[in-house]
């Protein structure tokens, strides 16, 4: 009897430890079209990307950042401008498509070139579907540009970050 109670107690403790001490998975969302830097890494198109190849959806950090890696050291390669990031040739209007692996209530989506916000789309505090697309007007820009796309979550202090390399105007060599 005592052995049965001991085994039951151990099982309850093991279950409670697993349930209450589990670290949340950092799997959420990224821009997959045009291919973001993390999408290119996951597809094997850029060498030496590190752990991002396994979790392109995990670039999450505090709101307000303006870098490609959300200040996560193991994803610092995403902000390395010396890497051969392929650029997608586009016209002056570009449709960005986000893919979500965990959907969160959304404050908004922001798109930046340099320090200039070129577009913002309201999320109305709603949970998005599995994919969301936004068409952004890049008139006034030409040549190689890096777009920082940000998915701001409405009920946390965090956001998800994706950088997309583009050749705006569709002419010239899209490679760095």
Can you annotate each of these PLM segments?
Residues 89-90, 103-105, 127-128, 139-143:
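Extracellular/periplasmic catalytic domains that process cell-envelope and extracellular macromolecules
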Residues 117-139:
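Extracellular carbohydrate recognition and processing domains
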Residues 5-6, 10-13, 116-119, 126, ...:
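Membrane-topology and secretion signals of cell-surface/extracellular proteins
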Residues 131-171:
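Extracellular/periplasmic metallocenter environments
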Residues 11, 81-82, 133:
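Active-site-adjacent structural elements in folded domains
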Residues 25-116, 122:
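N-terminal "mature-chain" segments and other terminal, solvent-exposed stretches
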Residues 173-176:
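Composition-driven, intrinsically disordered low-complexity tracts enriched in small residues
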Residues 1-27:
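Secretory targeting and sorting signals
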């Amino acid at each position: 009897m005592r052995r049965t109670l001991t085994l039951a107690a151990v099982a309850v403790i093991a279950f409670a430890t697993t349930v209450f001490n589990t670290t949340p998975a950092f799997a959420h969302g990224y821009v997959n079209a045009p291919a973001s830097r993390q999408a290119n890494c996951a597809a094997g198109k850029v060498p030496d990307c590190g752990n991002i190849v396994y979790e392109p959806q995990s670039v999450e950090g505090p709101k307000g950042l303006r870098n490609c890696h959300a200040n996560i050291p193991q994803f610092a390669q995403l902000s390395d401008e010396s890497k051969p990031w392929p650029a997608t040739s586009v016209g002056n209007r570009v449709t960005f498509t986000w893919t979500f692996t965990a959907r969160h209530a959304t404050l908004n989506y922001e798109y930046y070139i340099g320090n200039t916000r070129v577009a913002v789309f309201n999320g109305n505090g709603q949970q998005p579907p599995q994919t969301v697309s936004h068409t952004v007007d890049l008139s006034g820009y030409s040549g190689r540009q890096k777009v920082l796309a940000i998915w701001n979550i409405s009920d946390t202090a965090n956001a998800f970050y994706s950088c997309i390399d583009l050749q705006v105007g569709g002419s010239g060599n899209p490679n760095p």
